[in-house]
């Protein structure tokens, strides 16, 4: 059975996103979250009332919220996503285990529950999760920096998540015109250009995307 042009463009965009871009994002997130974890742990250990991420308690989080600091935001994070808190305690936040044992746990705190199911910074991470983490703009420090100052990783990742990943995940045949297909690949390429990767790696990824785009245009 012949594949319609719009269907083919959708499939090619989905496959190219998952095969070319998705595999390189977890390592970038890993580096950023590792830096954030170290920053927060150092900050907590330097406070008059010391604590740490690995020993964090509900009382610590409440106390930190009441005092303006780089850790004041902790209460707003999704602690239900770690230590089986939601499964065991539901919405009873006072009963949660607030220990943040690793950068992976820290990353899971920033995500909605349905995306916080990965166990490492690897292929178990959904691309939507990595794009959300890359696109977030309110970390206490800047943890994702482009190798090119003209590019803003947060905006580029958000653009890909909203206008490529989400649109491909919720298929509507009428969207997948030639113009929209071209725009999707432009957004994917723009994100690659903004990632903190070597020139050689960027060229490799851009070349792969170009080849996939040709497949989407070939009838």
Residue ranges and their predicted role:
Residues 1-167, 171-219:
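Feature for intrinsically disordered/low-complexity regulatory segments and propeptides
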